[in-house]
Amino acid sequence: MKRDDFLAQPEVEAFIEWLAANLPVLTFKLRFKSSKFVPGGLTVDVQGIEQVLEHYRWKASWRDSHQSAVDSETWMQTQGSLRQLREWLSAGVHAGDEQQALQACLQILRWGGVRGAIPFLHRLAASGELSSYLKKMAGLMALDADNDLDDLSSVERFDSGLTKIHALLDLSGSPIYDSRVGAAIAMLYALFRQQWAGRGKPLLRFPSGGARGDQIRNPGAFANCLAAPQFSAIEYAEWARWQVRLGWIVRALLGRTGWFADQGAMPARCHAFEASLFMLGYDLRCFGLTPVPEAQAVGEQGEVSLRESGNSGWVPTGHPFGQVLSDYLAFRHSGAPDNKNAFVDWLVAEPRNGKTLSRATAQGYCFPFSIDEFDLFGRSLAVLERIVEGGEDGLRAALSGETLEPFTVGDERVSVCLVDVFITGNAYARAESDKERVDYVVNAGYAGTENSARTLMAVGRSVGKHFGLLDVQHLPTPLFEQFYQGCSLDA
């Protein structure tokens, strides 16, 4: 589908009209906990989308090509920071300079507090394909071109880091579509659907992702609000299409209003609108609604669980980490196609100790393979063998870094395996009995039940011992202390 056809749909037009009428008058209660991204927190009530931008906060730091620190926190500072990153990225990509393009991409991720895309970016750069891939994607995602959403089926990876890279390379105002922006627009759409007289299945099921803390980023947590599909449940290409769809909607909306006129031309106005959504999406309680107790999100097929709604603490899908890595290496040596479906087929067809895995169990074993964890599919055999071997070298290979940088927890629920190692190491360091450790994990809010706490620690032990972060007694090692120095889960 092309832009004009998309915007001509009655429900899309009605949603844009609803936004134009309601966004200036809605009141938002911004309540941010103190964190490294928002030092001191934020408590303010504002009316209207334009007023939200005045309270933009995202404390970040990255290093330019001369290794000088570039710091930002306010919207004005962030604009300057992103302008530098955009120029660096654009220069590298258009010159075909793979190393400059790669370094710009890595610093964009550092600014955004995300790291999942690092292995993918390194692989593209090593094969000399990074610049050409980003240029191809830029053409497919431009908001002012005659492109078709179907053409985005060629997207190889997409996550909260890559959306930032693609948005910064774009010149037409393409939004960064992360969990917070997705949550905000999904909430606005849910409110629109409550008031709209039209019928039929929801046309604009904007996806979102989970927060690192107890913030709500799925409208389905509120009574009679449509739940947002989770990033983990949709294809990479579909996530990219939602970035384009949202961009089309924002340009159409700003084209009929004077909002953010002081920001400059249309692309700058689009990014100001996106930044305001980013602030609203931190916690959807800002819309003034009270979440349903033990909320069950309302999905297209009825109720779905809290986990599917993106509220599952730091509980992973249980899996035997070391064994799955060894299985994957054997699978790669078999010569089968290197993708999830083929690996799941292989796992189901290979009995273990006389037992055959169910397909659901085999799919669960792929938890650490996603781009949100270690992005293992597509690794070279040489790198994979280092990862399977484990230890510090295996961890560096898994994280695609020549040196082991201190682990940081971003704003979203990603890197669950490594967070679980951190939680597990701390649990064993402070408590001697199983009950005390389980109580610690549950009381801290990392898991909701005793069983889920045990699943969390089982994965934490498995991953931690594999990479030498935990010893045989599951206690933190010197490598643990080095890797997690300064790490905090406070959100």
Residue locations for each model-derived region?
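Helix-hairpin-helix
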Residues: 147-170
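Accessory beta->alpha helical hairpin/"wing" motif in late/C-terminal subdomains of nucleic-acid enzymes
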Residues: 367-398, 471-488
